[in-house]
Amino acid sequence: MSSYFVNPLFSKYKGGESLEPAYYDCRFPQSVGRSHALVYGPGGSAPGFQHASHHVQDFFHHGTSGISNSGYQQNPCSLSCHGDASKFYGYEALPRQSLYGAQQEASVVQYPDCKSSANTNSSEGQGHLNQNSSPSLMFPWMRPHAPGRRSGRQTYSRYQTLELEKEFLFNPYLTRKRRIEVSHALGLTERQVKIWFQNRRMKWKKENNKDKLPGARDEEKVEEEGNEEEEKEEEEKEENKD
């Protein structure tokens, strides 16, 4: 059987070539991993089955001593047979391939227009975003302190409302002097204290179904006088600014 299958092929292949094709793309030879391998002798003798353990040892012995760092970096995927070629027939040295990074650099060098176009596209995209982010038109009502825009509603803390309620129970109408004292004590403006007391008096009238608070005539007059003085001072400040 061996003479019928092997001898006709022996004349076709040279000594050192295998019965199997030598265009593998694997990390290790296929016959090394097997328990037995069909190999030829150095003198072109008849083939025979031999154990491949000593071939594996020689392969790794020569491979570790003969492989350099540059060769390992250039050929990480395919491992060529180092040492005597007669020990590993049929596994010719595969062409070394470059690393993925080297291939990527080569592709960039080979096609410089792609890289330049990508850079230009990214720069154009950033410029477009910057143009969109900055508003081209600024209307008066968009400004934070625009004259035509209403200010937000003032919120009072729990401590402020408690102190204002105490002051309201003691006297529902405040003089200007007392209003200044309360505003400084609570960290509010005079206008905020004045508006709070006005709203609180309206609430009390609705709850009690009365038009006026008891004994509020003199106090209303005092408050009106204080409001007039305040308005006059504001007018004087505006005139001085002009």
From Swiss-Prot:
GO terms for biological process: anterior/posterior pattern specification; negative regulation of transcription by RNA polymerase II; neuron differentiation; skeletal system morphogenesis. A motif (Antp-type hexapeptide) lies at residues 138-143. Its main location: nucleus. Keywords: Developmental protein, DNA-binding, Homeobox, Nucleus, Transcription, Transcription regulation. It comes from the Eukaryota. Residues 114-154, 206-242 are annotated as: Disordered. This is Homeobox protein Hox-C8. The lineage of its organism: Eukaryota, Metazoa, Chordata, Craniata, Vertebrata.
